[in-house]
């Protein structure tokens, strides 16, 4: 596989001679992963938009779909989806407008709110998921279970190691 706009291995190895601590193979892999992650984000953004969703909205719907009683607090949704409370509010406003979620005040403490997946939201997911999962399977069909397991482990390790970029 050759990704566009990435330095060729030959050029990377030439820089390795100029700069200390450059492992050409690591740099090529890192740049390839960086490029493919941008491409995946772009593809998925358009995919979800074409279906009246966004990645964020889809994530919220799935969290609620999997939750006990299809209900979670806005704070829990923000935490589980790794976004701010302000971002979750915007996502929930959009999902409520679409009729996919509703806000429910607790009976004992009216300040507490839970977000519930509506019947319409559940039906939308049940209609959407088979095709979505089929597309994911098509993307991954050339990989063995062992390769998938190894890749998931490697991505987890990579995720942890990205902390070296935090200042």
Curated annotation (Swiss-Prot):
Disulfide bonds: none annotated. GO terms for biological process: regulation of DNA-templated transcription; response to stress. GO terms for molecular function: DNA binding; DNA-binding transcription factor activity. This is HTH-type transcriptional repressor YetL. Signal peptide: none annotated. Negatively regulates yetM expression and its own expression. Binds specifically to corresponding single sites in the divergent yetL and yetM promoter regions, with higher affinity to the yetM region. Recognizes a 28-mer operator of double-stranded DNA that contains a palindromic sequence. The keyword Transcription applies. Keywords: DNA-binding, Repressor, Transcription, Transcription regulation. Residues 74-97 bind DNA. The keyword Repressor applies. Binding to the yetM cis sequence is clearly inhibited by kaempferol, morin, apigenin and luteolin, slightly inhibited by quercetin and galangin, but no inhibition is observed with the other flavonoids. Flavonoid binding may induce conformational changes and modulate interaction with DNA. Induction: Partially autorepressed. It comes from the Bacteria. Pfam families: MarR (PF01047). Residues 26-160 form the HTH marR-type domain. Homodimer. The N- and C-terminal helices from both subunits stabilize YetL dimer via extensive intersubunit interactions. InterPro entries: HTH_MarR-typ (IPR000835), Tscrpt_reg_MarR-type_CS (IPR023187), WH-like_DNA-bd_sf (IPR036388), WH_DNA-bd_sf (IPR036390). The gene is yetL.
